[in-house]
């Protein structure tokens, strides 16, 4: 209804699907603060790659984390809170699912890059950051 009100109803649709069951081809596929909670992030990234249009983009928004755990704890004021929440919520959730990789909310850019490279992406970059989030772009 809101898409119609905004004048975008002719080019917008909504569907309920999980990260490995949606159909179609997309210019942009987004994951907002969610990939680290998923048991099979490599498989999910691979599924996204298979559903991207030519020159399509995956936009990944994840909690801000530095790659080195010790530096993350000293230089990231949110790290202690996010490690605590991740240990209690995110990681157990991921471990309970198929594959159970358990990335957690403080995976960091290098680990996320590795996930997307394993899924067949060849370009991965930090598009932006805030004190709370990394905004990452992956392309084939």
Where are these regions (language model features)?
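C-terminal alpha-helical "lid/dimerization" subdomain adjacent to the S-adenosyl-L-methionine
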Residues: 61-119
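Core SAM-dependent methyltransferase catalytic element
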Residues: 119-140
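A short glycine-rich, Lys/Arg-flanked "PGG" loop and its adjoining helix->strand segment in the class I
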Residues: 42-54
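A short SAM/SAH-binding and catalytic strip from SAM-dependent methyltransferases
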Residues: 27-42
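A short acidic, Gly/Pro-enriched loop at the edge of an enzyme's catalytic core
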Residues: 17-29
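Conserved SAM-binding strand-loop segment of SAM-dependent methyltransferases
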Residues: 7-19
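Helix-to-beta-strand junctions that scaffold the AdoMet/dcAdoMet cofactor pocket
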Residues: 8, 38-39, 52-53
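Short alpha-helix adjacent to the SAM-binding motif of class I
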Residues: 1-6
